[in-house]
Each structure stands twice: as C-alpha cells, then as structure tokens.
Swiss-Prot record:
It comes from the Bacteria. It holds the Pfam family Elong-fact-P_C. GO terms for biological process: peptide biosynthetic process. Involved in peptide bond synthesis. Stimulates efficient translation and peptide-bond synthesis on native or reconstituted 70S ribosomes in vitro. Probably functions indirectly by altering the affinity of the ribosome for aminoacyl-tRNA, thus increasing their reactivity as acceptors for peptidyl transferase. GO terms for cellular component: cytoplasm. One of its GO terms (molecular function) is translation elongation factor activity. Disulfide bonds: none annotated. This is Elongation factor P. It comes from Macrococcus caseolyticus (strain JCSC5402) (Macrococcoides caseolyticum). SMART domains: EFP, Elong-fact-P_C. Transmembrane segments: none annotated.
Amino acid sequence: MISVNDFKTGLTIEVDNGIWRVIEFQHVKPGKGAAFVRSKLRNLRTGAIQEKTFRAGEKVGKAQIDNKRMQYLYASGDQHVFMDTESYEQIELSEDTIEYELKFLKENMEVHIQMYEGETLGVELPNTVTLQVTETEPGIKGDTAQGATKAATVETGYTLNVPLFVNEGDTLIINTTDGSYVSRG
C-alpha cells in the first residue's frame, strides 16, 4: 500500500479493480475543508484516461509491473511477434493492444513489454526513435515564415509535421510520447 501523498508521475497503482499509471497529480489544500490529491490516471489494460480525486493520506495498492526486454520481430496478420532477447521465448500481441506504438515500431527494435502477474499489458517504447522519411514535399526556398512546417511520412507509415528543411531520405529523431519531431538523426 502507498499513500496518495507519495504519488509520482509514472507510478503504477491498483484502484477500482484496474491497473493505472499516474500521468499527472496535484496536491490541493483548500482554505476550508480537508486537503486532497487530484490525479489523472491511464488504465494500462484499456488505455483509457480518467481523472480521480483522493483524500489526502488515503492508501492505494501499488502494482508491481515487470518490464521484459524484448525485440520486435514481425507482423503476422493483426498479431505482432516479440522475442525475449535472453530466453528466445516469443509472444504475440494484437494490433488493438499496441495501436499507438505501431506508429514507431520497426523490425528488430528493442522495447520493454509490460507484464503484470503474467498478463501482458503493452509495449513501452524508448523516449525517442530514429526513423527515415519516405515521403515529403520539397521545401520551397523563400517559404521560411517563422516556425513553418510541412507533413512528412516515415518508414512505419506515421505522418508528422516537420520543419521545411527536412527532405526524403533524411533520418529523424521522433518523441514517442507525443509523436513530435525532435531533430534530424
């Protein structure tokens, strides 16, 4: 058990028969009445985000999530195959489970698979990935308004906004948290 006063971003808790990750939290001390903790939680099974308020000092269960280092091998229909790099054991995850992560996954990429009591919850990507641009419009000289961007498609099929100087064939570093351009790779 852990007190809600000890919440940290990224902490995994058990509440209402679900496994949740703390995305945001805020301690609130109103002038009148008891203090409370307002939090934003992501359900690790469904991906749903919920706002929940706890009384200060309330206890919740701490969920022990195991992260297994695995390598993404290939897609087989709507199943995606990952291999444990130590035991060579393979697991399959459905496209629905890793829909967001597929935008950044390429073959042979190392990721962490999140497991809770033997149940596979999902894939944890690195903070950034390096992907190659497969399609974008050429940047037009003189078209340099402050912060101008254009659409670019990378090798996984994901489309994002990039600065005008990015060309086809360039490698980009992309933030996997929000899918935004970081820099050229």
